[in-house]
Each structure stands twice: as C-alpha cells, then as structure tokens.
Amino acid sequence: MNKKLFTNRFISFNMSLLLVLTAVFSSIPLHSVHAADNASVVANIVGEFQDQLGDSNWNIDSNITIMQYMGNGLYEFTTPTQLKAGSYQYKVALNHSWDGGGVPSQGNLTLNLANDSYVTFWFDYNTQSVTDSTKYTPIANDKLPRLVGTIQSAIGAGNDWKPETSTAIMTDDNFDNVYSYTAHVPKGDYQYKVTLGNTWDENYGANGVKDGSNIQINVTNDADITFYYDANTHNIWTNYSPILTGLDNNIYYDDLKHDTHDSFFRNPFGAVKVDQTVTLRIQAKNHDLESARISYWDDINKIRIELPMTRIGESPDGNFEYWEIKLSFDHPTRIWYYFILKDGTKTAYYGDNDDQLGGVGKATDTVNKDFELTVYDKNFDTPDWMKGAVMYQIFPDRFYNGDTSNDHAKTLSRGNDPIEFHNNWNDLPDNPNNAGTPGYTGDGIWSNDFFGDLKGIDDKLDYLKGLGVSVIYLNPIFESPSNHKYDTADYTKIDEMFGTTQDFEKLMSDAHAKGIKIILDGVFNHTSDDSIYFNRYGKYPGLGAYQAWKEGNQSLSPYGDWYTINSDGTYECWWGYDSLPVIKSLNGSEYNVTSWANFIINDENAISKYWLNPDGNLNDGADGWRLDVENEVAHDFWTHFRNAINTVKFEAPMIAENWGDASLDLLGDSFNSVMNYQFRNDIIDFLIGQSFDDGNGQHNPIDAAKLDQRLMSIYERYPLPAFYSTMNLLGSHDTMRILTVFGYNSADPNENSDAAKQLAEQKLKLATILQMGYPGMADIYYGDEAGVSGGKDPDDRRTFPWGNEDTTLQDFFKNISSIRNNNQVLKTGDLETLYAQNDVYAIGRRIINGKDAFGTSYPDSAAIVAINRSKSDKQIAIDTTKFLRDGVTFKDLINNNVSYSISNGQIVIDVPAMSGVMLISDDGQDLTAPQAPSNVVVTSGNGKVDLSWLQSDGATGYNIYRSSVEGGLYEKIASNVTETTFEDANVTNGLKYVYAISAIDELGNESGISNDAVAYPAYPIGWVGNLTQVSDNHIIGVDKPTEDIYAEVWADGLTNSTGQGPNMIAQLGYKYVSGTVYDSVYGSVYNSVYGVDDSGFTWVNAQYVGDIGNNDQYKASFTPDKIGQWEYLMRFSDNQGQDWITTSTLSFYVVPSDDLIKPTAPYLNQPGTESSRVSLTWNPSTDNVGIYDYEIYRSDGGTFNKIATVSNEVYNYIDTSVINGVTYNYKVVAVDLSFNRTESNVVTIKPDVVPIKVIFNVTVPDYTPDAVNLAGTFPNATWDPSAQQMTKIDNNTYSITLTLDEGTQIEYKYARGSWDKVEKDEYGNEFASNRKVTIVNQGNNEMTINDTVYRWRDIPIFIYSPSSNMTVDSNISTMEVKGNTYKGAKVTINGDSFVQDKNGVFTKDVSLNYGVNKIKIHVEPNDGSVYGNDQGRITELTKDIEIDVIRQENNSGSGTGNNNTSTSGSNSSSTGSGSTGSTSITSNISNTSNTSNTIGVITKNGNVITLTLDAGKAKDLIVNSKDKKVVFDITTIGEGQQKVVQISKDILDTSAANGKDIVIKSDNASIALTKDALNQNQIQNGVNVSIKDNGKPNVTNYVSLSNVVDITISGISGNVTLAKPVEVTLNISKANDPRKVAVYYYNPTTNQWEYVGGKVDASSGTITFNATHFSQYAAFEYDKTFNDIKDNWAKDVIEVLASRHIVEGMTDTQYEPNKTVTRAEFTAMILRLLNIKDETYSGEFSDVKSGDWYANAIEAAYKAGIIEGDGKNARPNDSITREEMTAIAMRAYEMLTQYKEENIGATTFSDDKSISDWARNVVANAAKLGIVNGEPNNVFAPKGNATRAEAAAIIYGLLEKSGNI
C-alpha cells in the first residue's frame, strides 16, 4: 500500500474517530513483536556465479554459499573472492531444497557487475526479501533508527525519551530503505520520534523534519502496530488503523479486490454452462463495508439486476473481509457485472480494469468497466478433430497451378475490366496503390491471376500431410470476378479458374482419405455487383436485381428483394465499395428476406448444406464453414444456418470472422469457433520489440505478464470447447505476412538483409512454438512455413515459392507440428500459466488422472512449453507444487531431447535465447491421484479442533489445509498424515477455521481437496448477568441516550486474566414494547410510523469496561425514539456469534418532552422509472424546534422497513437496492428533536429497463473543417460515417444525444462524412480497435461519454498561419509558420527539417524577402517502419503545401521620411488629398495640467493614417505628467479606417523608467501599454500600434454594440508579442442589460467569435477587457435562457452567467437547475469565471485520467490553487457540498480582488456545528461578504449537495462583490 496514503488515512481516522470503539472483532493475532528465531533454517545463495567460488552453479547442496544468520530473520553472505564483471541470475534456496520454488518463488533475481567486485547478499526470512550490495546499502548498525518517546515504557522498550535505553530498534526487512518496528501497544495517547543511533544527534519528528515536533498517536484499543521510517525522505508513519466498528463514510479502495483469474474470487474459472453455479467474491478491508451488491447486465434478456451479497468471513490475518454471491443462469447469455459497495454515505464501484482484460479489477467513484462472464449452452461442443488440430489456410489462386487448362477460362473480371495474367509464378501481386510510382509495371486494375486452382491443392495434399496439417481452410472458391472471390457471382458454381464441381469433390475425397478436413469460406453479407443476382453489367442471362431496377420494377427479378437500391441508382454496399452490394436486412435480419433465406439455408439443396454433401456422399463434401464478416449479419441468420448444417453434418464447424471478443457468438446456438486475431495480436505485441503499425492496427511491446493477462482474458471468455477449437492464426489474407511484421520483406531492399531474415524467422519460430503448444487449432497461413513475406493486401497474397522454399524453416514447422500431433496433451490437455516474467513465458499442459480437459480418457501426460524472446539464454525455476508431483521426468523435444525432472517442488529449465522449449513427460509415468477424502467431520473444542474422514483408496497419506473462509486462502498445516484423524491444537479460541483435506499416494500424486468443514473453537461461557437497570421516566430526545447499561460475563480461562478476554463479542439488545398505555396515548400520534414492524430486538455492540473479579464487564447505551415501554438485555458470544448466552430482560419507560408538536409532512415527489434504481426527492419539512433527520421507508407489498436515514439538510435519496420488475412503495418520515414523526405521502414505482439518453461529447482538433459524425454499431445507422451528424458546441467540441437501451454494447468511431475522414491516433495511425462502451444509467436515465479525437485521416498537417496570398508590411522581415501535425512527423519548411516530438502545434520562423515569398511545407513520416512500411499508409501521412506571402516593397521610408513635409505651430492642422503628406499636429495629452503640445508627424497612405511621435516631446510629457496614464488621443489626426502610432524605443523606455502607462486613444477603442506589457527583447527601434475600424460585425444570435476593432502591435524591426495582457477599452452603444455584454474576438481558423469577457461602464458607454493577443474584437450583448428555469428562483443569475459563457446548459434548452453539480463541473465554471485556460493533465490524482473531459480543467485549477484534492483523489464526479463549493469560491474571490480571509471563527448559522472545522471560517467570511446565504430557518446545510442553481448564484455573487458586473 502507498505509504503516503497510509499516513493520510491515519490522520483522517484520528480526526474523525469520536466514538469509543466497541468490542473487538479481532482476527488471528499478528506474529510476536519480535520475530521468532529461525536460526535453524539454512539459507543458500545459489546461481550462475557459484562456479567462481569453487562450486557448481545452481547447487542447492552447497556448503560454500551458506548465508550467516544475523538474528531477527536476517541472513547475510559476502563472496570470499571477487566475482567477474557480467550478468548473473540467482536466488535463495532454503534447507538445501527447492521446496516452494526458492526465494523469490517466481523467477530469478539479476546481478549486474560492471567490474570485478565483492558482493554481499542479504535475505530476510520473515519477509522473504532478497537483495545484494549492487542495489542496496544498509544503515550502519550503530546508527539504526529507533523509537523514542512516551511510548517506550508502554511497549517495554526502555525509559521514556531515552534513546540510549531504547530497544525499539527498526530494521529494513524489505531492503527498500524503509525501516520498521512492530510492537503491541496498549490503549492510550502517546508521543514519539525516531533517532538514528542511541543519541539525540540526529532525530526526526512530524513530517520527517529533522529536530521536528513530536508525533502524536492515539491508540483506541490495544493493537499490534508497525512503525515505519524512510531513510531517504525521513518520513515516519504507522500502519495503525482503528478497528472499523461502524460507518465512517469511507471505503478503502486499495484493499478492494476481485480477480477473475483466481478461483477464490470466481469459481469456476472461465465461461460456465447454463444452470452451473458460479461463485463470485470481493475483498475489502475488514469491517469496512456496510453492504455489497452485485449489478449485472444480461446481454440476451436485456435486463439489469442488482442482488445483495453476503459477508462470509475474513482473511487469516484479519486484514480483509469477503463478500460472496452464488449465481446461475437458465439460458445462454453474456453477463456484464460490477460490484456496488457502500459504507454510510460513501458508494464505490468495483469493475474490470481499464484494459477490460479480466483478472484484478479497479475501484472507482462511478460505474466504470464491467467484468464479463459467458454462459453457454450445456450441450455446446465441437468435433474432436477440431480440438488441437493443425490448420492450413490456402488462398487458392496463389498456392499451386495443378491444371493449366483452366488458366484462361475467363478473360474479364468485374464488368469489362481485363484480368491481368501473370505467366511468371514468382511475380509479385500487382498493387494499383503504387500506380504512378517509379518501377510500377501493373495495369492499375485490382484483378490479376496466377492460375492456382483446386487441382493444385489436391496435388499438394501429401506435402500438407507431411507438414502435419489435419484441417485446410480455403478462401472462397465460388464463381467470382476477382482473384479473392469475396465478391460472389454464383454460389452454386466453382469458379472456372479454380476448376469444376468434380475437381471439388475429388479434392474433398482425397483429403478425407489422408485424414484432412476442409473448411470453406462463406460470404453471405454481400455479393458481387457483377453477379447473376445483381447483374449490374448485364453479363449474365436472366434478370438481375439491378437490371430490374433499371427497367423500373425491381421486383421483376427473382433476386430483387435481396437488395436495397435507391431511386438514384445508389445502393447499400459493404463499407462503401460499390462492387459489393449488401444483402438487405428486413426487420433487423437477412433471414426475413424469405427468398434469400431459402436459397442459403432452408431449401433442401440450400447453399449452406449443398457444399457439405454435393452428391449424396458426405465424403465428397466439405466439413464446415468459415463465415465472412459475421458480425455484420444478424445473429438469428446464423442460428438458422447452424440448424441447417446440423442436418447434414452435426456440429460442423462454423468459424466466425470476428477480430475482437467473439464470446456473444459462442453461446452454443450458432458458431463454435472464431478466427482468433486477438491471439495473433498478443503474440506479436510480445515479440515485436517496438511500436509498429501492420496496417490493421498499432502494436506496442508488452512483457510476459501482460501477454498472459491478455491470453487469459480469451481463455476465461470462451466456452471450453470453443477455446480448444479457436483458429489461432499468426497471419491471414487480411494481414501483413508475419515475417514482414517481424521485420523481413524479401521484396524490400531496406528489409531483406540476412540479419533481418534471421531475426524475423527467430521470432516466427518463437510464435510457432507457443502456437503449437497452446490450446486451439494452430493455423498456418500458406507459405509462412516456406519463408514467404509480404506487406498488407495485396502483397500478403504472394505465390507459394515452390522450388525456392526456405527448407530449414519448413523442417522446423514439420518438427513442431509433429510434436503437437504426436502428443495428445498438447491438443486437449488442461492449461496453466507456469511462468510469466519479463522475456520468458511458460505454460503447462496436463492429462492427469487419466482424463483430459473434457473428461475423455487418455494416458497420463504432461507438457511444459516456454519461449524466451531475450537475446540471452534464460534459466527459469518453475514452482510445480500445484502442477505436478516431484519425480516427473521430461524431455525437451526441440532441443536434443535434454532431460529434466521435478525435484523439491520445482523444475529448473534452460530456455535458449530467442527460442523455446517443448518438454513432454516421459511415457508410462503415473500421474493419477487418489480420490479426495469424503465425510470430513470437525469437532470444535476448547483450544483445539478434531478432524476425521473416510479412507481414500490408494492413499498413503493426507495433507491438511486450513483457512478462515470457505472456498480458498488455504494454508497447509500438516503433510502426509497417515491416519484418518487429526487434532489441530494450534488454534485461537473465538476464531473461525475452515478445513479441507487432500489425499496423496506413494508417488506424491495429490488429489483435489475435500469439501470444506467449519469449526469454531471456544472457551465455554459459564455465566452472564448483573445487567443494570435504566431509570424510569426517561425523557425522549435526540440528545438523550440512556445512561450506560452494564453487564458481566465469565468464561473460565478467558475472562479471569487481566484485561479483555480476546474474541468476546458483547451486544446490547433493545426493543419497543407496543400496546402500552404510552403507545396508545402518545406513540401513534407522535412517534410511530404506520406499517412498520418494530417488534424485534435491535442489537448494538457493547464496549469492554474492565475486570470485575473473574468477570469481564461491558457497557453500551442507546437512544429511545418512541414514548412507552422498552425492554433490553445483553448477550455474549466467544465463537463468532455461533452461540449466544443472554442475560435476563429488564424494561423501563420513556416519557414525552415539552415538545409535542409534530413536523409538517414532507411531500414525496413521484419518481420516474429508472433501471435498477429509484431516485427519491421530497420537499423539506418545518418544525417549531428543528428537524433532526429524515427516515426513508420501503415496502414491496408487506410491512415497511427503514432502509436509510439522511440528515436534515438532505432532500433526496437514491435506492439502488432494488430489482427491475418489482413494485415498491416508499415514504419519507420527518423526525424532529423529540422524535416526533410525520409521514409523507406514499409513492409507488416499479424500476425497469428504460431507454437511456446517451450524450456523446467529443473534443476534436481545433482545425476540424467540417461536421463530425458518430459511426458504429448503432441501431439503424450501422457503421455509416455520414449518419448521426453531431452538433457543434464550440470551436472544438461536438455533441450528439442518442437514445439507447441500457446494457447495449456499442463499438464506434468518429468520422467526418466518410471513412477517408475517420479519426486517427496521435501518430496518424489507425486505432488498434474500435472505441467501446456499455450503456449504463448514470442517473436520471442519462449517460455522458466524453472522448477526444487526436487527428483526422485526411489532414496529416494543418497550417494555421500564414494564409496564402497574404500581404505584410515592408518592415516585417520574418514570419512565424504555425501548424499542427502528428507525432513522429518529419516537417520540412523551405528546406529546414525537424521531427515533431508530440501530436499538436508547431511553430517555425521563416525569413521574408521583398515581393512574393513561396513557403514550401512538406510532411512525411520520419520512420516508415512505425507504419509497417505500408506505402498506402505512408502516402496518407505525406503532404505538400505551398503558401505565397507578399512583403511590400520599402519605398515610402519611415519616420519623417524624405517625402514628408512638416510644419509646426500651436493647434495647427493640415489635410490633403495626395497619396502621401505630412502635418505636425497637436495631440491632446491628458495630465493634471491638461496641457497641449505638438508631439509628432502625421502621414497618410490611403485609409491608413500614421502618427510618428516626436521622441523628445513625448518623453518630456511622460516625465512631467503626474498621472500614471499618459493618453495620446489620435481621434483628431484625421479620418481613416486605420490609425497607427509609431512609438520609438526610447519613448517606451522612458515610460517604463517612470512607471507610466502609454494609452493610445482612437475613435472606437483605446489600448494601454504598461511598462512590462511587451516582450522587450523583441523591441529594437520601437513599435507600431495599429487600431483599425472594420465596421459593424455580421452576427446572428448576438446584438452588436460596437464596431469590429482590429488591434495589432508590430515592431519596426521585427515581431512583438505580449508579455502580459494589455487593457483595451471599446466604445459601445446602450445595452438592454449591461450584465450580458461582453467582448468577443474573431478566430480566423474557426471563423467563429469567441468569448473574452470584460467590464461595462454604462455611464461612459465603454467596456474594458484584458487582451492576451492581437486580434479583431467587438462587443456583443448575448441573451441566453433555458426552458426549465422560467419559474426558478435563480433564473436571472443563470441567464446572466450563461450569457457570459460562465455556465452552460446540460443541453441547449435545458439547464437543470435542481440537478446536483459535481466538483469537476463547478471547477470548470470557476475557470471560465477567471478566464483560466485548461492545461494538459499530468496525472496528479488517481481518480482522474487523461482523456476525461475535466482532466485538463482539473490540472489548471490544481496549479492555480483553486482545488486541492485529498492527497490522492480529486473526486471529480462527487457531488460538491455547499461548504466545498464555498471554499473554492472564496479562493476564486481572492484572485478577483485584494481580499484576505479574516479570522472570524464561528458563523451565525443555526447549524454552525455541522460545518467542518476546516470550512467554518471560510463560510463565515463568505457570509459576511454576502456571497453565501443560509436556507430558511437560518440553516447553511454545509454537507448538502449544491445544485446547479446554487452554483450559479454563488458565482454571480463573486462577480457582483468583486465589482466585475
């Protein structure tokens, strides 16, 4: 656990723990404070360096490398001689044995020596940690840290505050420089510090400060506590966490766990059959959770269900608790589940990890990812010949030409396009993508043929048989105009180029004779447009659908209803290819097109059945189908397809082409296998070694652990028969050749070196070793085994190199497939991961107990398959204790039959570099264990548990296992017990123990474990009593609990020693006795709730008080909430509540207080229907004294039960403990301070699945030129990039709202109207997979999804500026080119190149000559290998841009100029009509004396008037002015659209030196230049300040109040930028509401006006704002309202803030003022208020991740000090409380004003004590300023959730109080 987090939690507990803790639910005690002495254990350092010490490597029997025992579990060994420089593997062996795998148990440690060196090794037995002196330097013994303080005497560690006496010396048991000491600390308050050594010379206190203050610790109950000291940071902390005994409104995320790969958490592993029970468990910190529920979505029934879980126990060490639920399902389906965990007001969700791979999940504040569970038909199976087969995929045209007579059977391909015939078999396939490039010789048409045919395949059957192939998969072979045949022209015919039906039948027969099965490729989503069915080109007799359409009646064609043809002749086609018209889906399914369904499925000779039995002889037919783009065909079509082919060949393969998770296809009603592209991608990612795009997606390197996680994800999702029959491919006709993926391409001179080939083949062999050793059908793509390489389609379809094969590679494939075929264990043996670390991955396969994974009988056998991607040999030690017994021997069948054996629970294997091993157990070994013991009986005793069981046949001994919870966490406590009885005397009374037993035979074969047996050893409780009497006439009241109630217990041996008897549970029970006189007189009137059964006892824990003789005394109290008689008693148990002993029952009476007035009734609003939740809201009650709380009651038809209580300031509650389809009744009861109760009305609601309003928000690049569309698996818009156009929200945000069913799994992408404009990743790559989301109800039947698009396919580079044909002034000699391109792009601008290191904006300065300048910009990938050297992909990312910029000729001079004339004189002016002219003018200088002086020269050029300031006069005026602002008024210098003031640098310097601002005042605007406004290093001679009037803006939805003012500042000798904002004032006309007026700037990139802000001065008719850049500005009045705020109290402020773009609606028309606002939403509002821009998120908080819509806002707010988080979490999705909102608001107020917080202390609110201590003074200040106000009755409600209306009100208050509105 994170040490900092530990500290934070410790602090938070001490702050919040106010109640005295009750009886301890303790667990197994910690080990003794001082570790048990283990000197008898012999520890050896063993490894690859022992031979240098006169020993043999890995010798566990060595006496040379025995480590010296140093005490307290520490061992040490120093080499007697120096070890040579190099790298070594090592580990620790115990007692000269590998039992348990050594230390560490998984893998070896590495020692790297740069020079010859002595090395010291350390091993800690207690923590099982190992290190060496190259990695670790310990603190010297005399300086070891130790505890000093008042705690010393309490723990028996010397005298208080005396370091020289302290025996609490800390040790570094984990060798991580964190030292620790564990002690049993009695209850009490203590102070302590840590000293280094036995003096005060170096000591550390609170916060790790040297000589710092004492550290406080309050121990509320006796506890074993570990103290920690970090030698690097000097931080000091403990693991102390008070025992959780009640609700603390907190859940410890780090302790939550559910692991789908661990049978303890999910049993059984993987997919389950219908009606099979699956047990799901989740772990939490002990006593942390109030409740746990599971929420799951049924993918078939489309329903979400929530069910409660049961707490089943705790871990053996007492740290964790476990919750469980058992589920079963009566139909095949896919289940998506997550856990809902509650503790008081805190709710957490635990779902799958971010990668959604299963295994260990992740806790979040909101619903995140679901775990997946597949439930399949119990009769689902696959043919045995599929399981473990070796498959071979053939692209017929490129395999072999066996019949030359059909070579030219056709001459035309599609339409009238010719077929390009290749007479040279070794030609490369024509790639029309390369047309126009040097060396291209093709015809540019996608049709070329190499004459391969069915006869050719038949001729090569012997070759395939010799290769080990048992299944052939053929790409399509039916009549088609193309070479790939995925555009079928006639399903009833074999393509003439491939042969005849007779050739087909002969191939089938011949293959079957050789034991080879054949799978056909079926394409039933689309046909060819050049087919007998569509007949677009009229080449076929008969009337095709298109021909009939052309003739005006599509129905005239027998195929007319197969297609959708639009009135303009366009038609639905596959992914936009008009050559592939799609079969119509009628009412959601192609099967509903009757003629199509009959033709393919239903008819006697339907295509699905015919080719499995074409002539009545099954031997002449194919054996199954691979089905193209199956996920683009309705599923019910495939279920009918399955039923049809089952009538011909039962369970014939249906292999789905599905590139992702195909679990929904494998439920048992259709497909029974899938093309396992996931397997391919995982293997490539493990072996690739670099990021690489293979044309189908991006590959990124992973290690062995991630590989295992991914493969396990597939294993757990697929039904076992399907998993063992998956088509595990490394390549196909749709992917780059595997050798080329690994870096070799024979046709590419950059990739065809011998070294590249050798490396690629090594990686291919590695992949094949794992493929051939893994469950499933190992698929070989034709030619891979012969060394064929090639890029993506069409290059991956090269011809087989007959006569030029790589025979060495072929021999490898033959050998490896032979090993697979000859060893059944590699086909159907079970699967277990044995090793997954770094570069090495190893799996185990077993047939044990004479059965394989399917229960089929085979001889016992085992295999270990391992691959090593490292360039160095690896020796791995595999723990086999749970895999196989000792003594089993193996031979490595691919490495010279090297022998291995299991010894001491371990096998040590040498795995060669860049290679692997295939270990097969030697024949004849007995791996069959006895049956597990039965009839296990346990008897609980005092300090012991007795066990007995029945003898198992063949057993020679038994192992005894023990846990604290059923179903797992077992620890072996006894081995090889020879009797059938056992006494466990090593138990602690009062704890739960779970036992299980296994049987072992004489060889060591161990059975599975028996059923669990549970025991509770305990002391017998002899007596309970002395219950004290509560005083009668107890006055009712929320602050009037009973006096303490005492009782005593005696249990001999437990209570008669000093202190609390361990594991004793004491509880006080109390109940209201109805029917009393008080009840009839008062109760029903004042205190009761109608329909509630309160007749039972309520139990609360009692607290240990002390010893009374031999008895232990306990106490508790309660607060009666009804008037009348109450009964109470105490009960005790010391065996976990299995048995209780109770005292006698006593009673007392409760009487009314003076307050007999009931609260007013709350009104409960009718909730809307939601799925799996009920959202309640009510109007608050009032009371003459005060409301205490609200109680929520629920009934499902019977009595009402109280389900929750909320505070008096909360008026809403969400009940998620409901089941869809069940009707519930609710009421809310208001409770006042005397427990007077008033009920609300009753509402009735039935939660049910409802459509969810799903809001997709996407942030796109700011250069996005056109509309954005959402494409994916959406109903009625499947993968249509031109449908579902999104609404533009702002410059780079688009949104669309859809209605989708909850639980729907959506895959999607963003595009801009076509697939040529689809989104890309930051490298410009295709995304490896589609975006995925499960639709859930996030509240109010809504869901919001926030995404980011990084790039667009068609825009590899975008140039913001300059624009082409742009003209610039003559004084501009350089220009900035600003653009945006992808990461890794090589950008060249006018010959200068650079590589873009990140996706996004770049800038580059270019020099300008006078006249026309051509700026040439080129972009291309810097490293083509990142894109697989795919020329098509590289071409997409390559672009040239040329921009013309005209720099004006310098012919008018500068300053006074030779063409200027000047005159001087007071108040003189001259105007002229020439193109140039000059006038000396008087400019009005505003200062205290209001003097006027002549200060410059005016020149006019067209509409541009320039004033050049006289430096001497201007400086004098600046120096002499008494005002801070010196105004140069240029309104009187003449009429012109543009006015320019030239200011020399010495004028600017004078202004800066005198602290004066220069103000340029023009006709419609003024600009103030402060001394540090401009970047001084960019100013050489001075600046030109230009103010240009562009007239009235053309806008809609806004009221224009000013002209457009274009402000620029340029340098006389270069560009000038702003160093800080400058103040600009615009003249405006009168506004209807000045509060809604703001300045906007025009963004030329987006052609949009964007909000800036500003402050209106209505009296002067101006608005002033701070400009951060030069642009065109204008002032608008914007009046924004929403439909749902018409009657809302905050209508005015919401409209004002919306008009100022500070708050936004949930939609364009809905604000939702009463909806609670989240912390992230309020933070975003504050940022907009302060005009703080988002910043790129850098990962400060664990609950915020990059890509979240609020991530960059959180970053900006955090850096600005607006938010703080809680040290780890920002809690962005939590509803913000009123006190949290106030705190953030006041930080913003401080940034708006000069405000400093006063120390006021308490507020004047009536609920001041409810305000958190940290917030009270902040709230007091805010109230004093009038920024916040209380609610009615002077209540602030600090913990109440703030609404969106309240958020708007407080922000408006900030604006108003800071004078900004």
UniProtKB/Swiss-Prot annotation:
Catalytic activity: Endohydrolysis of (1->4)-alpha-D-glucosidic linkages in polysaccharides containing three or more (1->4)-alpha-linked D-glucose units; Hydrolysis of (1->6)-alpha-D-glucosidic linkages in pullulan, amylopectin and glycogen, and in the alpha- and beta-limit dextrins of amylopectin and glycogen
Entry keyword set: Calcium, Carbohydrate metabolism, Cell wall, Glycoprotein, Glycosidase, Hydrolase, Metal-binding, Repeat, Secreted, Signal
Protein residues bound to Ca(2+) 2: N401, D403, N406, D407, D453
InterPro entries for this protein: A-amylase_C (IPR031319), Carb-bd-like_fold (IPR013784), CBM20 (IPR002044), FN3_dom (IPR003961), FN3_sf (IPR036116), Glyco_hydro_13_cat_dom (IPR006047), Glyco_hydro_13_lg-like_dom (IPR004185), Glyco_hydro_b (IPR013780)
PTM field: Glycosylated.
One GO term (biological process): carbohydrate metabolic process
A Pfam family that the UniProt record links to this protein: X25_BaPul_like
Gene Ontology terms, MF aspect: alpha-amylase activity; metal ion binding; pullulanase activity; starch binding
Residues at which Ca(2+) 1 binds: D248, N250, D288, D343
Domain CBM20 as annotated: residue spans: 1246-1354
Keyword NAD attached: no
Compartments, as annotated in UniProt: Secreted, Cell wall
Ranges for region Disordered: 1448-1486
GO cellular component: extracellular region
Active site: D628 (nucleophile), E657 (proton donor)
Domain called SLH: residue spans: 1677-1740, 1741-1799, 1802-1861
Membrane as UniProt keyword: no
Binding residues annotated for substrate, in chain numbering: H526, R626, H733, D734, D793, R797
Biased composition (Low complexity): 1450-1486
Family from the record: Belongs to the glycosyl hydrolase 13 family.
Name of the protein: Amylopullulanase
